[in-house]
Amino acid sequence: AVRSDTVGKPIRGVELKIAKSGEVMYRSVGSFKEYYKNPKATQETKDKDGWVATGDAGYIEETSGQLRIIDRAKDVGKMKNGSMFAPKYVENKLKFFPNILEAVLFGAGQEKCVAFLNIDLSAVGNWAERNNINYASYQELASNEKVIEMMKEHVEEVNQDLAKDTTMSGCQIHRFLILHKELDPDDGEITRTRKVRRSFVSEKYDDLVSALFKGDNEVSTKTEVTYEDGKKGYLEATLTLVDAQTYMLKEKSDAA
């Protein structure tokens, strides 16, 4: 059967395998022989046995044999226990909720995953008005207890979904915080096309990442920001660090 969440099964004459790195490899009589006058590129992409590197990370479902693509291979890492760490996959699940504008997952080389969240000011602001919650700024709304509880529900819903997936269950979010400011291209945190600059964010907010992994309940921080007129300033905040419920792996039969 055709499924929207997988690529499907390989057609006749095509072999698939998953490299130790998590990258999807294929082999077929129809694959290219070599790059024109570029043996180095050929060697980097195709091994001596004819397996071609796709550049994508994924896995083959054990029961259905269908291929599921997770992310670009270069963006996928490993957690401390060797399980796959695919941040964009989890971040996209979080951003499926209209209330979450942006998410950044951390966990490569760690025992567990933690996350930063940006609320969507428009969506959450409308919700706040309907629920008679007053606020004067993004920072004030993001720190509201009811907003934090809403984000916790979203995170735990994603965790429940991840717990159904043998390969991705290790990426459940154990702790999170709502950032006191939106990630901004003017501050170098995201690109103009809204792609998170993960390494930059991790370094800039190292105190917040460390606090999440250490198990602190709150953390005070001071962040340099760029205003609309180009002037620089500082934003101070005390952030609540939230524990999220995680779930045991739920074995399920993949759809046929």
Where are these regions (language model features)?
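Gly/Ser/Thr-rich phosphate-binding loop
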Residues: 1-2, 15, 101
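Conserved C-terminal "lid"/linker of ANL adenylate-forming enzymes
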Residues: 102, 127, 156-255
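Short Gly/Ser/Thr- and Asp/Glu-enriched loop/turn motifs at secondary-structure junctions
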Residues: 72, 108-112, 170-174
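Active-site loops of AMP-binding adenylate-forming
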Residues: 1-6, 38-41, 121
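Residue-level signal for inorganic ion chemistry
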Residues: 16, 94, 115
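Adenylate-forming
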Residues: 31, 66-95, 124-145, 169-170, ...
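C-terminal boundary motif of the adenylate-forming
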Residues: 55-57, 97-123, 162-163
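Conserved ATP-binding/catalytic segment of the ANL
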Residues: 10, 17-79
